[in-house]
Amino acid sequence: AGQYAQEQSISPVKEVTNTGAANVEFKNLPFGYYLVRSSLGALCAIDTTNPKAVIKEKNEKPIVTKEVQENSTGSWGKQNDAEIGDKILYQSVITAADGNPSNYVFHDTMSAGLTFLKEEVSVYINNAETPLTSGYRILTGQEEGKKDAACTFEIHFENGIIHTNDVVKICYAALLNENAKVCDEETNSVYLTYGENGKTTIETTKTFNWSFGVYKFT
């Protein structure tokens, strides 16, 4: 019912936004029949015989983590060292904790010293040995359908490809290019948008370039 109301653009009688409190309350509603829908998917029908009702949200928000590989050791963490021309490997993991995963879009933003390698992207679900070959689109630059113009690339997942409690691993790579800052960091940040207007916190990794020039004087 909630999905139908959204698809038919049925305007809500009242909207309440949770700003961090444990509870939200609808006030001054006339008696009648109501369908209450949360952004995480909880539904509750309320009728005139029970004007006070409590809705407990059992769904959780999806979680995104991100790591970068240190070339010298092969270990994964929040930062690494590299030289110009090195390929940098990343992996991000989405845990679909929400009750009805939909409208999943993975957003990635790389700083100027990193060049995204689109052909290096692989997506795995639930520790599968082979990556997905369909069910998502990769959009870069100013491609039509891209939601955040500032992002380097986005992965748009088709509804139905990800289910509740699925774990989605995204593996990809970039080159440290000539714009990389010396003795400073290049950043790679990711977040996920989902549902009607949900958004996870931003996860960031850092790559440090310790290259230095050699000068000869005569």
Name each region found by the language model.
Residues 1-218:
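Solvent-exposed loop/turn and edge beta-strand elements of beta-rich ligand-binding domains
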